[in-house]
Amino acid sequence: MIGLVGKKLGMTRIFTEDGVSIPVTVIEIEANRVTQVKDLANDGYRAVQVTTGSKKANRVTKPEAGHFAKAGVEAGRGLWEFRTAEGEEFTAGQNISVEIFAEVKKVDVTGTSKGKGFAGTVKRWNFRTQDATHGNSLSHRVPGSIGQNQTPGKVFKGKKMAGHLGDERVTVQSLDVVRVDAERNLLLVKGAVPGATGGNLIVKPAVKA
C-alpha cells in the first residue's frame, strides 16, 4: 500500500469515552493527484508519482507545467513518489484521498525537523558537561578529546562534534491512527511528528505494524 503527502497543522488533544486525554497531531491530507505511473518496462521499477496542494501559475516552470498538463492535473506544491507492489493499479489524473487510511492502525510519518542552527555538543549530542568548579575555569561545555595520538593521526569520520542541528529528514515510526476525517481531509495521529506547522509530511502504513 502506498502512502500520502500531507501538511502538519499542529497539535491538540482529544478525549476518549473514559475521559482519557490523547495528544494528537493533526495532518491535513488533501487529495493526492497522480501525475505519473512508473512500470518495469519503461522505468525498471513500479511506482506512482503524486502531487498535492496548489502552486501559483507564475511559480510553475515550463517543464513542470508540461508534466502536470500531460497528466491532466492542477500544478501542486511538489512531487513525491511511492513504490507500488505488483497488482496495485493507478492511472494518471487519479485522486487518492485520506480514506485509504480508514483501516490502518499505525503509520510512519516522515518530515523535515526544525532547524536549530549551530549547536554545541551538549545540545546536539547530549554530551555531559565537565565540572563547574574544582579548578575548571574555561572547559565547562567543551567536547574534550577528539582523537588519539600519532596513530591513527586523524579524527575519525562520524566523530560527534559541534555543528548544524536539525533541518534534516526524520521518520517517526508506528504512530497510532486516532481518527480519519475524510470529510475535512484530516488524519489525527497520536503523539508528535517532525517539523514545523505547515511543513510537508509523508504518511505511510507502518512497516513494523
From Swiss-Prot:
UniProt PTM: Methylated by PrmB.
The protein's name: Large ribosomal subunit protein uL3
Subunit structure: Part of the 50S ribosomal subunit. Forms a cluster with proteins L14 and L19.
Top-level taxonomic group: Bacteria
Organism: Serratia proteamaculans (strain 568)
InterPro entries recorded: Ribosomal_uL3, Ribosomal_uL3_bac/org-type, Ribosomal_uL3_CS, Transl_B-barrel_sf
Role description: One of the primary rRNA binding proteins, it binds directly near the 3'-end of the 23S rRNA, where it nucleates assembly of the 50S subunit.
Segment forming the signal sequence: none
SUPFAM superfamilies: Translation proteins
Record HAMAP family: Ribosomal_uL3_B (MF_01325_B)
Keyword Disulfide bond: no
Single Gene Ontology BP annotation: translation
Pfam families: Ribosomal_L3
Residue numbers bearing the N5-methylglutamine modification: 150
Region Disordered: start-end pairs: 133-153
Gene Ontology cellular component list: cytosolic large ribosomal subunit
GO terms of molecular function: rRNA binding; structural constituent of ribosome
UniProt record similarity statement: Belongs to the universal ribosomal protein uL3 family.
Keywords, alphabetical: Methylation, Ribonucleoprotein, Ribosomal protein, RNA-binding, rRNA-binding
